[in-house]
Design a protein with these regions (language model features):
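C-terminal or late-domain output modules
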Residues: 227-237, 242-246
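Active-site-proximal loop/helix segment associated with metal-binding centers of metalloenzymes
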Residues: 106-171
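Single conserved hydrophobic/aromatic residue that forms the stacking wall/gate
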Residues: 1-9, 13, 247-251
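Conserved beta-sheet core of the metallophosphoesterase superfamily
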Residues: 82-89, 102, 107, 112-126, ...
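Short, basic, glycine/proline-bearing loop/turn elements
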Residues: 7, 35-40, 157-165
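Structural motif
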Residues: 96-97, 223
Length: 251
């Protein structure tokens, strides 16, 4: 959300506002922010209206679930304390309205790159986080935001980030197929991270969905207890947008 225009942020808020009457839970699948780090007394500026809308939804009894992504790993206790959000740091298997879901950002099941796994382990290491927290935010925020935006732009420009790779090469699909062999009770695998929209049958009782993003597709997933489907929030924009994958659970 750091690099968005005011109009785009308002669009995001209107989308959350449109579901407040019938949603029972909202699940954000990671990378809610381009960069987020919580010091003991300092958090990133901005996001007031968006976080205010989430607080309003939480006050109405709607559960707010947030998976950490690879861009906002360093969420700690600020959002749980301020808006009652539930933070998930790894994949989660959960029953929702009668079906079994396997949820995650998606980078958790990417076992292809040793370098990526090493960086991820360093970023999640508590001692490394403690060392990083000792650096003044004047230096860390500018550097990290620049790195994050660079990483996102270069990633979206790569062919890998633009196109579906096929069942045998798309690593989330490969993971889901293997996992399903030992956990046949999973009805839906749902991930973000890849910036593609995908809805694929894995078996007669199981599907995998990759939720797209809010930079290109303005996409989200709805589960009402009977039907699970992907939809898009359609409104004219002025070009750039922001990554935001979510699941909206309604009753």
């Amino acid at each position: 959300l750091h690099s968005t225009s005011r109009r785009q942020r308002q669009m995001c808020i209107r989308d959350r506002d449109s579901i407040k009457e019938d949603a029972s839970a909202i699940w954000f699948l990671g990378d809610l922010f381009d960069y987020w780090y919580e010091y003991k007394y300092v958090v990133p500026k901005g996001h007031v209206r968006f976080l205010g809308k989430l607080a309003e939804l939480a006050d109405r009894g709607i559960e707010i679930h947030i998976f950490i992504g690879n861009h906002d790993i360093w969420m700690f206790d600020y959002l749980p304390k301020e808006i009652g959000a539930i933070i998930h740091r790894d994949t989660l298997t959960v029953d929702l309205l009668g079906k079994r879901f396997f949820l995650g950002h998606g980078d958790e099941v990417d076992f292809r790159s040793k370098a990526f796994r090493l960086i991820r382990a360093i970023f999640r290491n508590k001692f490394c986080q403690w060392l990083y927290a000792g650096i003044h935010p004047r230096w860390t925020f500018g550097f990290a935001l620049g790195w994050s935006l660079n990483s996102r732009k270069s990633g979206l420009e790569k062919q890998e980030a633009k196109k579906y790779q096929g069942e045998d090469a798309e690593y989330m699909v490969v993971f889901a197929k293997e996992y399903l062999k030992t956990h046949p009770d999973i009805n839906f695998f749902i991930f973000g991270h890849r910036h593609i929209m995908l809805d694929l049958m894995l078996s007669r009782t199981s599907r995998i969905l990759i939720a797209g993003d809010w930079m290109q597709f303005f996409s989200y997933i709805v589960w009402d207890g009977e039907n699970l489907y992907m939809d898009q929030f359609l409104e004219e924009t002025d070009g750039q947008s922001y990554p935001l994958s979510l699941i909206h659970i309604s009753e």
